[in-house]
A protein has these predicted regions:
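N-terminal periplasmic accessory domains that precede
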Residues: 97-102, 152-155, 172-175, 187, ...
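Extracytoplasmic beta-strand/coil segments of soluble accessory domains associated
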Residues: 153-192
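Gram-negative outer-membrane beta-barrel transporters
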Residues: 750-752, 757, 770-887
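Transmembrane beta-barrel wall of Gram-negative outer-membrane proteins
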Residues: 27, 261-364, 381-395, 400-401, ...
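Short acidic/polar hinge/loop motifs at secondary-structure boundaries
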Residues: 66-67, 192-220
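Short, acidic, small-residue-rich periplasmic hinge/interaction motif at the N-terminus
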Residues: 33, 37, 44-49, 78-82, ...
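Outer-membrane beta-barrel signature, preferentially recognizing the C-terminal barrel domain
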Residues: 378-395, 600-607, 666, 695-753, ...
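C-terminal beta-signal and adjacent terminal beta-strands/loops
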Residues: 877-893, 918-969
Length: 969
């Protein structure tokens, strides 16, 4: 009791001292805005001349310098590419001086000042990067509005070190500095967005419209007050509070898709903002919608190596499967956002809400040549899905005793991934090939019989998926700024955060079982309009064909393959969607529950308690030092199912036995030290160094204690609740050169990653093991240290020094080179060639690149703006990378890495071009033209092969053209 009393007395004395300090010293505060458009200037420099005292403006252009002794000072406002201003002020004891600044763009060599949107956007991004306390890349609001990107993922990929994972021809997820999407964190105003994936921790960024964003930040080196689970880095979408006066904008556009030869794409957005009650209350509301055609066509193939090796010992690869695919897909996006802020006498309170939704309607028709099994299949799939993300946040900032800075936040967010209806119908032709072909794609197609009279209904699936992730967060931070004379300033800061996650994954399947046509015919319930082979009791595929033809299929390929069934080299009639729906309605009583998918169901709880302490020191306005440590405790609880399936001759699960609920729990503590050093070498150059430790938690489904034991097929699969968290030491160095004409940076980084997890498949030879003799697939932590080494160059420049009309050119370019090494667990079975021919399993490793790590990345953008006209052409080159399978079946732990390098799968290199042309009409209106994927680039994957790469997929998505109008008021 005495110790508690002494502690309280001590705290009161400290707070009283702070209060006295606040009363004897003063402060200066205000806002900096752009003279051209009245918009706030974030991350501008505000300094007390002749000292190292100063600060930078926040996201809304506000600044505050506290703890000033009474006296006269000169306040300096500076912002790259803008005129520097100096203002004399007098600070009184306990007083507050309000001084706002309106900054103008600086002229070059006597030329008339021409302020363009491109130049303003570039200046904003440069100032943010140069004045940041950590290593960060930025896309400003102005640049976002200048780009033709369809979603936030595409815009993030403009930054150095970022590569895209594409789906439907557009970016959906991002790989940061060679680390796959699951290793990175996505936030809105610092609040983490829940994962949208059904297996891992990745976030689908395609549902976020760029219309609602005020900026995008890519943090490459973490600070102790940031979430620690971001080995690749953190992407933060920023919003802002309302500025003065009623303002708004609206945009509408429509477009054309060259692949589908269809008009009808559209996109629209609207936003309003204003301040009320003497600027005390600010409100921003906005929303938007989009319809996008994401259809595609192409083919995929798989290879086998059953022929063994050639004379040189190289594996012989032959084609086992060829699939021709046409997807007709439309995506609808909806977004809404609102920000309400209240200014207090000594602080502020802000409520923000962001909502995003993507609806996908897809019809896929696929022709499958299964030469390895001597049959051909045609299948039809109709899928409807909805992805939603909602993030609500209430936060406050308060100044206490004139010295302390307190901020707090509470948030609720959720993500959901629902597929309420996925219907798949499959037809099969047995003995589908005239002879054993030479196993090339062309040979397989030529050898196919294409016999419609022997192509019959195999089965129908009707699936539903429901994944939901709810997150609750509370946090508070306390900061104490201090000064040691006029040349040293800094702060100490500490805080805590608690986040609880609850996640549910539920999958259901109804199916007809195999040979459903035979059952229907046996019951005498066949439709009289069907084509039926009564001898074999087959319901023929011709019963489900319609009047729709895909005569343009493969017109963008050198090859000429045909999707529709039939013997002629034409695209015959396609499976009719309405006839598939009618079958589901008329024969609903033939559907039964498929129990195996229940093994994919799980419930997960995750609680993370975090705390940190850090300090920052600035010496002589030259050296900035930040040091601190973060602590995170993770408590996991999972619930799933164990079971043994019984399968038919195709390996399809018929029923389940021995279903048992299983649970798993885990607690893990981790400490994350972090160090940052910034050296301002001159007024136009600085050097930054950082050494930080970060972590990454395993995929949800890897931690779930599910298990399936299939003795009929001699395999078992399971999750691993005791997987270790990954941890990484990250070392960064970046040199920045900046001035009126832009920014040039040279950066390098090195990452050492421990306990990265992969999938191991091995045979169980321990007689005491319950699954003795089976092949077991499970996630394991890899041995050895995985490493990533990278080099980045980033140029953002303008040509204002050139005479008119060439002074309207703006250039952005960045290049990234990456190298990585990781160690994949593999299992080798060795059998003695003499009696008793016993076998042993050798679990070993092989080295290779990190999955998703691209060797080379290049972004180039050249823009021109003059007298209301602007144009920008941009290019993104993305080199090869190990393939990351985003379509892995739930419950199947798959990987893209083979047991030997020749079996590795790769995503091919792509070069993509986009074009934007704009023309202002009067002051408020602007016409624009967007052309995406100018060259209709093919997206391909390969298998490494023994001698040459072998093509495993080849898809095109078409060029899209959009025209529209923007209105600002």
């Amino acid at each position: 009791m005495k110790r508690l009393r002494n502690l309280l007395v001590g705290m009161l004395l400290i707070l009283n001292g702070m209060s006295v300090t606040g009363q004897t010293r003063g402060e200066v505060a205000g806002q900096l805005t752009d003279a051209g458009n009245g918009e706030p200037l974030p991350y501008a420099n505000v300094a007390i001349k002749g000292t190292s005292l100063g600060t930078v403006t926040d996201d809304n252009g506000y600044y505050r310098i506290s703890g000033l002794e009474p006296g006269n000072y000169t306040l300096v406002f500076s912002y790259l590419s803008y005129k520097t201003q100096e203002h004399p002020i007098r600070v009184e004891a306990g007083g507050s001086v309000t001084l706002n600044g309106i900054l103008e763009m600086a002229a070059i060599m006597g030329e008339e000042v021409v302020v363009t949107a491109m130049l303003r956007g570039q200046s904003g991004a440069i100032n943010r990067q140069v004045n940041s306390s950590t290593i960060v890349n930025v896309v400003s609001k102005e640049k976002i509005m200048e780009l033709p990107d369809q979603n936030a993922a595409e815009t993030v990929a403009r930054l150095p070190g970022v590569s895209l994972v594409r789906d439907g021809g557009e970016g959906t997820k991002v790989t940061l500095r060679g680390m796959a999407p699951r290793f990175n964190t996505i936030t809105i105003d610092g609040e983490k967005i829940p994962s949208t994936s059904d297996q891992d921790r990745s976030v689908d960024l395609s549902m976020f419209s760029t219309d609602a964003l005020s900026g995008i930040e890519f943090y490459k080196a973490l600070l102790p007050d940031m979430d620690g689970d971001a080995i690749g880095g953190q992407i933060n979408f920023t919003s802002r509070t309302a500025s003065g006066g009623f303002k708004g904008n609206a945009r509408v556009q429509t477009g054309y898709n060259h692949l589908s030869k269809a008009f009808g794409q559209y996109r629209g957005s609207v936003a309003f903002e204003n301040r009320f009650f003497n600027d005390r209350l600010g409100v921003i509301v906005g929303g938007g919608l989009q319809k996008a055609d994401r259809s595609s066509e192409g083919y995929t193939g798989e290879y086998a190596t059953e022929l063994g090796t050639d004379a040189d010992g190289n594996l012989i690869f032959t084609v086992a499967k060829l699939n021709l695919t046409h997807n007709m897909e439309t995506r609808y996006r909806y977004n809404a956002n609102a920000t309400i802020d209240l200014k207090l006498d000594h602080g502020s309170i802000v409520f923000s809400s962001n909502f995003g939704q993507t609806d996908r309607e897809e019809i896929r028709r696929r022709r499958r040549y299964r030469v390895d099994a001597s049959y051909q299949e045609h299948d039809f799939r109709e899928r409807h899905s909805t992805n939603r993300v909602l993030s609500n946040r209430l936060n406050g900032e308060h100044r206490l005793f004139g010295v302390l800075e307190l901020d707090w936040a509470g948030s609720y967010s959720f993500s959901s991934n629902r597929k309420p209806s996925v219907t798949t119908m499959s037809f099969r032709e047995l003995g589908a090939f005239n002879a054993n072909p030479e196993r090339t794609y062309e040979d397989i197609i030529l050898a196919a019989k294409n016999n419609l009279d022997a192509t019959w209904l195999k089965w129908v699936y009707d699936d539903s998926y429901d994944v939901r992730d709810d997150n609750y967060t509370l946090q508070a931070n306390l900061k104490y700024p201090f000064k040691l004379g006029k040349q040293i300033q800094g702060y100490v800061k500490s805080g805590a955060r608690y986040r609880h996650k609850y996640r549910v994954n539920d999958i259901d399947r109804l199916w007809t079982q195999h040979f459903v046509g035979q059952d229907i015919i046996a019951d005498g319930r066949e439709d009289p309009d069907w084509d039926v082979n009564y001898t074999q009791r087959w319901v023929l595929m011709s019963s489900f064909l319609g009047n729709e033809y895909d005569r343009d299929f493969f017109r963008f390929f050198d090859e000429r393959y045909y999707l529709g069934p039939g013997q002629e080299n034409v695209n015959g009639p396609l499976i009719d969607a309405e006839k598939v729906k009618a079958f589901r309605t008329d024969y609903a009583d033939y559907y039964v529950v498929q129990p195996a998918v229940d093994l994919s169901d799980y419930q997960a709880g995750e609680s993370i308690t975090a705390g940190y302490g850090m300090t920052s020191l600035t010496f002589f306005n030259r050296i900035d030092l930040i040091a601190g440590v973060r602590y995170e405790r993770t408590e996991n609880s999972y619930k799933s199912i164990y079971g043994s399936p019984r399968v038919d001759e195709d390996g399809t699960v018929i029923n389940m036995t021995g279903l048992v609920d299983t649970v798993g729990n885990r607690v893990l503590d981790q400490w994350l030290p972090m160090f940052h050093l910034k050296f301002n070498m001159t007024g136009w150059a600085n050097l930054r160094l950082a050494a930080t430790k970060s972590l990454s938690r395993p995929n949800f489904f890897s931690l779930v204690p599910w298990e399936v034991v299939n003795r009929g097929e001699s395999y078992a699969e399971r999750g691993e609740p005791n997987l270790e968290h990954m941890s990484a030491w990250n070392y960064d160095a970046i040199l920045s050169l900046y001035g009126k004409f832009g920014l040039l940076t040279f950066g390098g980084f090195f990452k050492e990653v421990e306990n990265i997890d992969y999938t191991l498949t091995s045979r169980v030879f321990d007689p005491a093991d319950p699954i003795y003799g089976l092949t077991l697939t499970r996630p394991v932590n890899a041995e050895g240290m995985s490493t990533i080494l990278g080099f980045e160059v980033d140029l953002q420049s303008n040509f204002r020094f050139l005479p008119s009309p060439f002074n309207g050119i703006v250039v952005s370019a960045n290049y990234t080179h990456l190298q990585s090494e990781t160690f994949y667990p593999i299992s080798i079975i060795e059998t003695l060639d003499v009696f008793p021919f016993t076998s042993t399993v050798i679990d070993t490793i092989r080295s290779g690149n990190m999955p998703g790590q691209v060797d080379n990345l290049l972004n180039l953008s050249i823009g021109y703006e003059r007298k209301g006209f602007s144009a920008r052409i941009s290019m993104i080159y993305q080199g090869e990378s190990l393939f990351v399978d985003e379509e892995a079946e739930i419950g199947r732990l798959t990987r893209s890495v083979g047991a030997v390098p020749s079996k590795d799968n790769f995503v091919g290199a792509t070069t993509r071009w986009d074009l934007v042309v704009k023309q202002k009409i009067r002051k408020s209106f602007e016409l624009f033209l967007y052309v995406n994927n100018l060259t209709n680039v093919k997206e391909q994957t390969f298998i490494a092969g023994s001698k040459n790469k072998l093509l495993t997929s080849n898809f095109v998505y078409g060029t899209t053209v959009d025209v529209g109008l923007t209105y600002r008021f």
